[in-house]
């Protein structure tokens, strides 16, 4: 009977250790996914900012070109 108790405790202990390791791995994966999401968000934000800056520069250049055509002597 004592042998069965020891075996049962050993099985339960190993199961808990295995479960603990799985939970830890799951948490690590979630952290990695969050970091990837943060990096992607930051990349999108910087890309939007760059596009916005380029569009503003293109708009100013176009406005200056139109002003140069409409008012050739002024600048």
From Swiss-Prot:
Q: What Pfam families does the database record attribute to this sequence?
A: DD_K, FSAP_sig_propep
Could you confirm whether the keyword Nucleotide-binding appears in this record? no
GO cellular component, alphabetical, reads: extracellular region; membrane; other organism cell membrane
Comp. bias (Acidic residues): 30-40
In terms of InterPro entries, this protein maps to: Dermaseptin_dom, Frog_antimicrobial_propeptide, FSAP
Region Disordered: start and end of each range?
A: 26-46
Propeptide found at 23-45, 74-75
Q: Which cysteines are joined by disulfide bonds?
A: none
Alphabetical keyword list: Amidation, Cleavage on pair of basic residues, Membrane, Secreted, Signal, Target cell membrane, Target membrane
Q: What is its main location?
A: secreted
Signal sequence, start to end: 1-22
Residues with Proline amide modification: 72
Q: In which tissues is it expressed?
A: Expressed by the skin glands.
Protein's cellular compartments: Secreted; Target cell membrane
**Summary of the function given for this chain in its UniProt record:** Antimicrobial peptide with weak activity against Gram-positive and Gram-negative bacteria and fungi. Has been tested against E.coli (MIC=96.06-256 uM), S.aureus (MIC>192.12 uM), K.pneumoniae (MIC>189.00 uM) and C.albicans (MIC=384.24-1024 uM). Probably acts by disturbing membrane functions with its alpha-helical amphipathic structure. May penetrate bacterial membranes, but stay at the mammalian membrane surface. Does not show hemolytic activity. Does not interact at all with cardiolipin.
What is this protein identified as? Answer: Dermaseptin-SP5
Q: What is the lineage of its organism?
A: Eukaryota, Metazoa, Chordata, Craniata, Vertebrata
């Amino acid at each position: 009977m004592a042998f069965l108790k020891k075996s049962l405790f050993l099985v339960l202990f190993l199961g808990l250790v295995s479960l603990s390791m799985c939970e830890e791995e799951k948490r690590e994966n979630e952290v990695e996914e969050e970091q990837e999401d943060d990096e992607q968000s930051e990349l999108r934000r910087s890309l939007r900012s760059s596009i916005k800056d380029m569009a503003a520069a293109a708009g100013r250049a176009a406005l200056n070109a139109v002003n140069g055509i409409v008012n050739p002597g002024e600048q």
